[in-house]
């Protein structure tokens, strides 16, 4: 994994992660597509239990770092699924136990910041799980916002964020971009998924914040970073 190689090379004081949960198994955008649901049922990718396990196992590689996980829109997929789904009428029954367990957590207010942060903190108590209204500033850069939500609940964009009175780095757009003091990282996913049809600006890319406050994109081309060669 080239991202982990980069982290080991830099040994940063902080590691900021976005969208650690995809929500593919219960994606609300696909719940009414019978053909996608048929495929998921056949290949087993509609198992929420398995997807949660993959997420938690993936975070194992970061446990020795000072990790902060930004609340992201894909995290919301799970809470939205719990609110809007009647488990008795769901496309599959395999997620019924998770539905019951996670709903109980919400009912007794055990997971006020959402199910994904609750599960992460349960296994990795040293990792910080940031809420939507939290702030985390590193060397002058705000890094606690995902970028999907802007001022006063509006839709976020770099054009809007560049007007803030602080510099900011977000992670929602999957494409590296810079507009004055507003930066967006790229993605660590596959560059082609179901929903990014047509010409794409997606790129594997991270942002590093230097000790002097300068922020720099590190792009991965053909699966490798070349900045330090």
Residues of each region from the PLM?
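Core catalytic region of metal-dependent phosphoesterases/phosphodiesterases
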Residues: 1-109
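A generic local structural motif
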Residues: 2-3, 56-57, 129-136, 153-158
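Flexible, charged surface loops at secondary-structure boundaries
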Residues: 7-11, 61-64, 119-123, 136-139, ...
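Polar, enzyme-active/binding microenvironments
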Residues: 9, 222-229
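A structural signal for short, well-ordered beta-strand segments and their strand-loop junctions
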Residues: 15-18, 66-72, 128-131, 143-144, ...
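Noncatalytic linker/hinge segments flanking ATPase motor cores
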Residues: 23-31, 56-63, 109-114, 181-192, ...
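Active-site-proximal loop/helix segment associated with metal-binding centers of metalloenzymes
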Residues: 85-142
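Conserved beta-sheet core of the metallophosphoesterase superfamily
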Residues: 140-224
